[in-house]
C-alpha cells in the first residue's frame, strides 16, 4: 500500500518526487557516513566481526560448529584470516576476542549451518512482512527486535531471547483469527503445562551451576596469594559442573600450569579453546609445551595466539624468549625486533616491562627468566 501511494505520487509529480527521493537518499547517506566516522573504531570492529562470522558460516556450511562453540570457531577463523596475508593496520587494531558475533543471525547460521540461517531469515522476514501488511503492530516490534539483533547480541540475554520468540509468534498470528474449539486449542493449552513440568529439572541444573560459580569465585580469591594448590583442589571438584564455562576452564588450567601439572593443564585449556576466542589459552598452553620439551608445539601455539589478535605483544614476547631458550638466537632477535616495532593498541606497565626485556634480548638472546603472568 505504501508502495502504491508512492507510485501514484510519482505519476502526478514525477520531477518533485524524484528530487525528494534523491535528497532523502543523500541525507541518509551523509548521516550514515557521519555516524561511521564518529564511531569509526567501533564500526570497523563490527565489520571485521561480521566478516569473520560469515567465514565461519561458509567454512561449516552444512551443520555449523554446534551451539555454544561459536566463540572458539571465531578465534580460529580470525587467526586463519590474519595468517593468510598482511591485513590493513586498522583491521589488526580492532581485532578482539568477542564472546558473540554481534549479529545474532550470522551467529545462529555459524552454529547451525546455512539451512538454519536461511530458515531463521525466511521465518523472520515472512513474519515481519505479513504482520505489517495485516497492520499487526507486533510486526513493527518484531522488525525492531530483528534490527537490534543484527548489530548486537540480545539473544545472549534470556528475557530478550524469549521476547523475540513471543514477538515472532504474535506477528504470525492473524489479528482476526476465528475462534477455535477447546480440542483444537488443546496443544496450545498443553504447552505451558509441559513447560511447568520441565521447569523443576531445568531450574535444579541452573541452581547447581550458579552455586558452583559462586563457590569458584570464592576460591579464586586465593589466586592473588598464589595458592594455586587450593584452586586445583576445588577446580577438580567443580570441573564436572563448570566444564562449559570458559572462564573457569582458563583459571583452572592456569592453576594446573602454576602447580606443574602441565599435561592436565593442556587438557583443560584445549577444552577452553573450543569455547573461547581468547588467545591467552594458547599462550599458557605454549608455556606448558615448553616446560614439557615440546618446542614445536609451543611455537605453533604462540603463532596461533599472535594471529588471533595481531596487535598484542605477549605472544611475540613469549615466542622470542622460546627461540632464545632453545638456542635459535637469530630467530629470537628477529622476533624481538618485530615485537618492538609492533604498534600497540593499549600500553601498560606490563607491556613496557616486556619491551625492556626484548631490548635486552637483542643483546642477550639466552635470557631464561619468564614473567609469572601477564594480561596482555
Residue positions per predicted region:
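Transmembrane alpha-helices of multi-pass inner-membrane enzymes
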Residues: 1-5, 23-24, 120-123, 135-184
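Membrane-interface helix-loop-helix junctions at transmembrane boundaries of multi-pass membrane enzymes
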Residues: 6, 10-18, 125-140, 261, ...
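Internal/C-terminal transmembrane anchor helices
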Residues: 14-34, 181-206
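Hydrophobic alpha-helical transmembrane segments in integral membrane proteins
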Residues: 31-48, 192-225
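Interfacial juxtamembrane loops and adjacent helix segments
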Residues: 67-110
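Alpha-solenoid helical repeat scaffolds
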Residues: 216-217, 247-251, 280-285, 314-318, ...
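Short coil turns that delineate tetratricopeptide repeat
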Residues: 243-244, 276-277, 310, 344
